[in-house]
């Protein structure tokens, strides 16, 4: 089984290291810069459970060096997909499956979903439909990623907590390709449930991200602080209820109540969201996949999003001023 991880940052590097150490697959990564140089020189190192492991991976700067794969795991952020298309497509053979590990609403959302929106392309995450055309939604295996992982230094990945990667076909089918990949990941020591409704699980994670991420970026607050404050907690709750109405109109099942989801966020403690961390470090922010796409879904389903609209306007303006959004 030939697998390439495209984007070997924290999550991509962790998955690559786990699969490589298990030694059951022909594992390659596409990386760049100091990270790539370190991996080529010293291998990919993983710190997990107090131990440092050396993962034997093939690292390349260009996908052309690797050729067609059985599986390509896209572990880069959503806003990086379109610029990377020329690099990704050389990895795609006739039967290559593509595992999408981006946060937020996926570009393939309306593939094999049925109903009047079948085949709709979301401009917020796939401007001009380029990803849809060049990768093809028929290749996709959806996923929801839960591990907390850090890049401590170039070539050095540190696992913090969590080992679950949920997988699911857009159609809900338990196909041979998703089953085989899940089995390999489980043998590598990961928890990999195969879902018959991956969209609902995507929404439950998105539910918190679309609210807490922009609020944290706007206020500089941690999750615990946002939940402890009556004003910001109410703001997050209102955004979540607007999103829930959209999701339910699309057939999504929310297995927990909104207040329980908010409490869970607060219980995480003094944690800065990824969007706040990106803002502080001057990096591109995941605004479109986490917030703009939900607004677009609201327009498609005729569900009002006044609070989401207002927060989106503010966080987008802030990001532009800081050079974190264009």
Regions found by a protein language model. Name each.
Residues 1-52:
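NAD(P)+-binding Rossmann beta1-loop-alpha1 motif at the extreme N-terminus of oxidoreductases
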Residues 26, 225, 233-326:
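NAD(P)-dependent Rossmann-like dehydrogenase/reductase catalytic/cofactor-binding core
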Residues 38, 91, 126, 132-205, ...:
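Internal alpha-helical scaffold of NAD(P)-dependent oxidoreductase catalytic cores
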Residues 53-152:
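Rossmann-like NAD(P)(H) cofactor-binding subdomain of soluble oxidoreductases
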Residues 92, 106-118, 157-169, 220-225, ...:
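Helix-loop-beta segment of a Rossmann-like dinucleotide-binding subdomain
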């Amino acid at each position: 089984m030939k697998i390439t991880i495209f984007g070997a940052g924290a999550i991509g590097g962790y998955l690559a290291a786990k699969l490589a150490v298990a030694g059951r697959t022909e594992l390659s990564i596409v990386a760049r810069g100091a990270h790539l140089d370190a991996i080529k020189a010293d291998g990919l190192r993983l710190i997990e459970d107090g131990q440092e492991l050396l993962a034997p991976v093939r690292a390349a700067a260009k996908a052309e060096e690797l050729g067609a794969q059985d599986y390509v795991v896209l572990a880069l952020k959503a806003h990086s997909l379109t610029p990377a298309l020329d690099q990704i497509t050389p990895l795609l053979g006739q039967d290559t499956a593509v595992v999408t590990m981006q946060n937020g609403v996926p570009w393939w959302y309306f593939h094999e979903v049925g109903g009047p929106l079948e085949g709709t392309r979301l401009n917020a995450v796939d401007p001009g439909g380029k990803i849809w055309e060049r990768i093809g939604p028929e290749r996709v295996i959806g996923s929801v990623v839960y591990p907390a992982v850090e890049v401590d230094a170039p070539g050095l990945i540190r696992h913090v907590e969590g080992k679950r990667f949920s997988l699911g076909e857009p159609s809900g089918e338990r196909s041979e390709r998703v089953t085989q990949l899940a089995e390999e990941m489980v043998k590598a020591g990961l928890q990999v449930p195969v879902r018959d409704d991956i969209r609902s699980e995507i929404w439950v994670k998105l539910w918190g991200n679309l609210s807490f991420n922009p609020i944290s970026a706007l206020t500089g607050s941690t999750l615990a602080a946002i939940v402890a404050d009556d004003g910001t907690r109410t703001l997050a709750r209102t955004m979540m209820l607007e999103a829930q109405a959209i999701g339910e109109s699309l057939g999504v099942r929310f297995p927990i109540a909104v207040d329980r989801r908010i409490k869970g966020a607060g219980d995480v403690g003094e944690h800065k969201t990824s969007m706040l961390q990106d803002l502080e470090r001057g990096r591109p922010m995941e605004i479109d996949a986490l917030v703009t796409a939900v607004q677009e879904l609201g327009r498609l389903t005729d569900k009002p999003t006044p609070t989401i609209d207002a927060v989106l306007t503010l966080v987008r303006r802030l990001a532009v001023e800081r050079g974190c959004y264009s």
